[in-house]
Amino acid sequence: MDKMFLVQGDMVGVSFWLVSIAMVASTVFFLYEGLRVKPQWRLSLLVAGLVTLVAGVHYDYMRDFWVVNQSTPIDYRYIDWLITVPLLMIEFFIILRAVGGAVGAGSFMRLLVGTLVMLVFGYAGEAGLMGYWLGFGLGMIGWAVIIYEIYGGEAGKAAASSSESVQSAFNAMRWIVLVGWAIYPIGYVAGAALGGENNLNIIYNLADFVNKILFGLIIWNLAVKDSGDTAH
């Protein structure tokens, strides 16, 4: 049982611990705040809370896996991403629908397909089911599909016709996907180029901390602003 405790100086284990606690705290925050905003925003905050809840549970398992094995919890991490990343993509769709944006189901399907391509090939590369760099390249194609859809596709065009506050939040969310998500391929490359699982896991943990929590905070900020004095 002693192996289940963090070893002093294990910075990777510490990063797993910090992210797991941050995810749990964020979940409580998002779910509580969802009770104080307009009804049309409650689903968005519920989804944000689900993202951090699922991530928090998986990080608890990933932390223990790392402490015991001192190796990358690939399966746990990708199971987490297969659940949470599609939920993040759903947020784009929900926000536009909440403000009456004209966006069809096709937009969501393209975001979903891009997400699955990105994750499935990323996992295949890291798990050794195909060439490491081939999996990386094919996964990047999925990311490119997502970027196109939220910038130049139907979702991006629907956001452009929305209110200024929605455009501001949507742009911030797009920047997270464009810039914040770039941390993930950096971690993927670091796992091979720098030859260490420590670098890969710390970078991945940092990316999840920034992208999942900050993503939800942007939605919360928009929901509170739009709710105004009606929030209670």
Residue ranges and their predicted role:
Residues 1-23:
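Hydrophobic transmembrane alpha-helical segments in integral membrane proteins
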Residues 26-29, 91, 121, 142-164, ...:
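Alpha-helical transmembrane segments in multipass membrane proteins, preferentially the mid-helix core
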Residues 28-34, 63, 69, 78-111, ...:
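Internal transmembrane alpha-helix with an interfacial aromatic "cap," most often the third helix
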Residues 39-49, 103-109, 170-174:
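Membrane-interfacial loop-to-transmembrane alpha-helix junctions, especially the N-terminal start
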Residues 46-65:
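A generic, lipid-embedded transmembrane alpha helix
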Residues 68-79, 130-138, 197-207:
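Non-cytosolic membrane-interface motifs at loop->transmembrane helix junctions
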Residues 105-107, 133, 154-179:
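Membrane-helix boundary/juxtamembrane motif in polytopic membrane proteins
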Residues 149-152, 172-232:
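C-terminal transmembrane-bundle signature of multipass membrane proteins
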